[in-house]
């Protein structure tokens, strides 16, 4: 099967994307007649594969036995597991890592002047994958996120794409759009309202700046002077440096601030956390109230998870925000896999 299509995105690396690949599917059945397909794609800049089950009923998946073995002298840049992905990518030679460890995607490798980035794409109805490795071993094992040692796979289940981006230089990896190409198209045809950009972030310099409209207006002025696009709140939207507060609901000057920002072509992100937004009623209230106040985006915090629930929440929150033409910024967040 040949794939050859073009598409556009509201933002990204290029004005037009080309998705061109050769695809082949290998079909297997076990003695019980259960079906397994392995779908493989070859691109100019990498390869990817996924598993597809022929299950007609929900099934529980407990393990995945996928492994990837590299040369022991391979140089790697990868993050040790941490729930909020706020860590570093130290350079390490693969077979010199002397302790058992779990790592997060993406994993960048260099061996024999060949660069490769290992990651995954299209993760919507399953937990994200991590990698585990034994001491001095050059073999990675795919493991599911900690919260989902077992999860329920819906009928006709498809895994994420196991993705390998390759190039002779690091620029080939950086410029690749393989993850985008492996994802399905959006359900939204109207994307003209999407305005990505740089944000002024008052909390970084003054974690109580959110309490004072005059201070926030100065940050709006800064954003306008710097030709940035956004002002972004952080913990909390109003009046406390800690977790979510309901006080913002009664603050009268938020519409004045957003109107002032719009006069200078600056849009404003609000802030809240998953414990408020993990149900539709909570999202409906916050999203609709934000729009009434003139806020054009929301920063969603403290997801801290790669579970199936967390991956599906991100997709749901983005879809519901998009219906209101509202941007979403996730904080302490997993890597981009396509949502």
Q: Where are the regions that the model predicts?
A:
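An acidic-aromatic substrate-binding cleft motif
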Residues: 157-230
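Aromatic- and carboxylate-enriched substrate-binding clefts and catalytic-loop regions
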Residues: 235-339
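Generic recognition of flexible, low-complexity loop/linker segments
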Residues: 37, 149-152, 219, 257, ...
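Short loop/turn segments at secondary-structure transitions that flank enzyme active sites
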Residues: 57, 74, 169, 206, ...
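Short, flexible loop/turn elements at secondary-structure junctions
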Residues: 30, 42-44, 72, 167, ...
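N-terminal accessory beta-strand-rich subdomains and adjacent acidic, glycine-rich linkers
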Residues: 1-182
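Long, contiguous hydrophobic alpha-helical segments, chiefly transmembrane helices and signal peptides
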Residues: 47-49, 68-70, 161-165, 198-203, ...
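Conserved aromatic-histidine-acidic binding/catalytic patches
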Residues: 39, 207-211, 245
